Amino acid sequence: MLKKLKNFILFSSIFSPIAFAISCSNTGVVKQEDVSVSQGQWDKSITFGVSEAWLNKKKGGEKVNKEVINTFLENFKKEFNKLKNANDKTKNFDDVDFKVTPIQDFTVLLNNLSTDNPELDFGINASGKLVEFLKNNPGIITPALETTTNSFVFDKEKDKFYVDGTDSDPLVKIAKEINKIFVETPYASWTDENHKWNGNVYQSVYDPTVQANFYRGMIWIKGNDETLAKIKKAWNDKDWNTFRNFGILHGKDNSFSKFKLEETILKNHFQNKFTTLNEDRSAHPNAYKQKSADTLGTLDDFHIAFSEEGSFAWTHNKSATKPFETKANEKMEALIVTNPIPYDVGVFRKSVNQLEQNLIVQTFINLAKNKQDTYGPLLGYNGYKKIDNFQKEIVEVYEKAIK
């Protein structure tokens, strides 16, 4: 579930004892028995960066997420200090308190962590933005935690990438499975009971027994039967000019799930007939509009849209905005999903000591395992994993997704 990208910085599986650490080079592993920390290096207070918009969201004059975050911090402090006191290397150190501070966005989070200012110790960031940041600033912050989410019932395997865009392409096959859920039983007709709406997601679309450490974007198409057939023909013929002229809705230029991942698919599929979205948009400005995919049905001149994979899963069909609504003789369907990109990554400022990092990572894992994480699941984080090798587990997967 990708709803977390809209709402927060911090939050938003295999559960094993603490036995790892990520080096400052972001590629190696430091065994716990090799790590030592002095009393002066021990932080008695740790601050997490949390989305300012989420943290300050109000309803009736009250901050609606205040209780959620307070309960989470209480649970986190209790579990962390239990682990600390059970560890011979840390049991004599002071117990640690935890608090949150508001952060505007992912870019601000990375910039603040890179200053190594103890007013901000940790946050969770989009993997793509993190990888690109570290290319220009190697070793300046320390990735240590990978988030996971309940997998979609139609997409449980990360190792599926673009092949040729035909019906046998694994990414097209996923799109066809999406259509069985979204189109064959029309989304507009879903009831809260039949599809298990819990106030945040349609639970029927997820398999909580399988944790996914990746997400994708997707390309929607819309129209009556004749228009859909023409769009598909342009796709199959690799006729970029005709395809683009059906009009494309997209997200911000820096969005991976609503711009960059789809751009990679278009490059691979249309090859030398396509350059970049920005170049093509400059040449054909009327064919593009920055707007949410769930509004595609309301726009007569646009028939293609980019979105997060399965965004309807966390979009209530009874919303006043009437998401994904189309004209009576038209429908929306998935054309193809994108390559997978790693889910979000937890990052420490450089000087947080290694033992404390280890304990924080294990605390995240334990809270999820014991159903005591009152914060993450509301926004799409259902589990956590330690990162043993940032280069292999995150960077290489990311690079493969966008090439």
UniProtKB/Swiss-Prot annotation:
GO BP annotations, alphabetical order: regulation of cell migration; regulation of protein phosphorylation
Lipidated positions per record (S-diacylglycerol cysteine): C24
Annotated InterPro entries: CypI (IPR010592), CypI_dom_I (IPR043099), CypI_dom_II (IPR043100)
Covalently attached lipid (N-palmitoyl cysteine), positions: C24
Signal peptide limits: 1-23
Record's bilayer topology term: Lipid-anchor
GO cellular component: host cell cytoplasm; plasma membrane
Compartments, as annotated in UniProt: Cell membrane
Record keywords, A-Z: Cell membrane, Lipoprotein, Membrane, Palmitate, Signal, Transport
Disulfide bonds: none
Function: P37 is part of a high-affinity transport system.
NCBIfam families: MG289_thiam_LP
Name the UniProt record assigns to this protein: High affinity transport system protein p37
